[in-house]
């Protein structure tokens, strides 16, 4: 195999990882909506909507983790295309691909994740605030 074929094979490997990470983000959002909707229906009558924050935070973390990983692999992909000599053939190591966009906090508050989870968190948060306000005004 010549160098160009190695590069194409390596890019295909990295592209497959990127696709899996994107698919994981999609699945996590689906599970988050399903589980949090079920919790909403069960906990609404009992008034314990604050419990919804536990799985919400866990799903938010998982989604952010996978987006971070996806960004790291996209950086690796770009380095392979650029012909970076620091990238070892067939290596999927992303240690040298860190930047400000690949930090977990940047992923958690990105445009594709934060609005989704903030919107979901708005319902139990508003319910808890109204309940507290109702309690304080008695």
Regions found by a protein language model. Give the residues of each.
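Cytosolic-side membrane-entry/anchor segment at the start of a transmembrane helix
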Residues: 1-38
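Inner-leaflet juxtamembrane helices
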Residues: 17, 48-50, 54-100
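Alpha-helical transmembrane segments of integral membrane proteins
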Residues: 24-27, 31, 50, 54, ...
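Lipid-exposed faces of alpha-helical membrane segments in multi-pass integral membrane proteins
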Residues: 35, 51-58, 122, 126
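Hydrophobic alpha-helical transmembrane segments
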Residues: 37-45, 124-131
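Helix-coil boundary and interhelical linker segments in multi-pass alpha-helical membrane proteins
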Residues: 43-50, 137-138
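A hydrophobic membrane-anchoring alpha-helix module
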Residues: 88-138
């Amino acid at each position: 195999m010549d160098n160009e074929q190695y590069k194409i094979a390596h890019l295909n490997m990295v592209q497959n990882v990127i696709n899996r990470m994107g698919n994981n983000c999609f699945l996590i959002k689906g599970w988050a909506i399903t589980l949090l909707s079920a919790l909403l229906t069960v906990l609404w009558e009992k008034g314990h909507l604050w419990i919804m924050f536990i799985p919400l935070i866990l799903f938010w973390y998982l989604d952010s983790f996978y987006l971070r990983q996806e960004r790291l692999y996209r950086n690796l992909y770009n380095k392979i295309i650029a012909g970076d000599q620091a990238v070892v053939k067939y290596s999927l190591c992303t240690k040298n691909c860190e930047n400000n966009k690949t930090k977990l906090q940047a992923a958690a508050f990105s445009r594709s994740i934060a609005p989704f989870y903030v919107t979901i968190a708005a319902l139990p948060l508003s319910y808890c605030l109204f309940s507290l306000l109702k309690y304080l005004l008695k």
